[in-house]
Structure formats: structure tokens, C-alpha cells
């Protein structure tokens, strides 16, 4: 990993700090798509489970993949699309996202930024 990649990862981790024990990956199947937790599992063992009528949802031998620098690097170079889980296990969060999409979205966004500034809350 070069210095630029390292700096990208550290910037991402500082802006989008969330759970580190799990992250989401994007999936596509037919005309549907979405995000699901990234898991580590033995595909051969799972295939046997599936052949016996099991599903991935009730497959007991899967564990979450941790959000590592390597997983972030794969995201940055386009190998995978990931999402973070911002809600921590203690029901707190390090960041929030605000969506302004009505007629007066610019004014609302400026008001939001001003309110954050008044409360010393970093906003970008």
C-alpha cells in the first residue's frame, strides 16, 4: 500500500467512523440490488447446507468480516462497493447524513451548517 492509499484510508476512517467488526457489501441479482453484511464462511460447507434445504439466513457457520484497511483498499480501487454501519453497538454514532431535496434545499443546507457551527459540530 502506498502513502496515498494509506492517507485515503485514514481520511475515510476519520470521516465515516462506524462499526469496525462488520461492514456491508453491495450485491446485484437479476434486476435487484442492495447491501448486506459481509460474511466469512466456507462455501463448500454452505453448499452442503443449501443442498439440504438450508438458506444463507439460517446457515449457522458464518461470521462477520471486519472492516480492515484491506477491505477499504478494495473499495477504493473498485473491486467491491461497501457501506459502513454508523450506529455503534451502544446506540451512538460518530456521524450523521442530512438530505435536503425540497425547493429551498440550499437555504436549508446553509441553515443546517450554521446550526452545526453554533454548536461546534464539524460539518462538511
What are these regions (language model features)?
Residues 2-124:
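Signature for HUH/AEP ssDNA processing cores
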Amino acid at each position: 500500500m502506498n502513502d496515498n492509499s494509506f492517507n485515503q484510508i485514514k481520511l475515510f476512517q476519520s470521516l465515516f467512523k462506524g462499526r469496525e467488526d462488520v461492514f456491508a457489501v453491495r450485491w446485484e441479482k437479476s434486476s435487484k440490488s442492495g447491501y448486506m453484511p459481509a460474511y466469512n464462511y466456507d462455501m463448500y460447507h454452505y453448499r452442503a447446507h443449501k443442498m439440504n434445504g438450508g438458506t444463507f439466513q439460517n446457515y449457522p457457520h458464518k461470521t462477520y468480516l471486519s472492516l480492515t484497511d484491506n477491505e477499504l483498499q478494495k473499495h477504493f480501487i473498485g473491486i467491491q462497493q461497501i457501506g459502513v454501519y454508523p450506529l455503534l453497538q451502544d446506540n451512538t454514532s460518530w456521524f450523521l447524513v442530512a438530505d435536503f431535496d425540497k425547493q429551498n434545499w440550499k437555504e436549508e443546507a446553509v441553515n443546517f451548517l450554521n446550526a452545526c457551527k453554533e454548536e461546534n459540530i464539524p460539518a462538511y
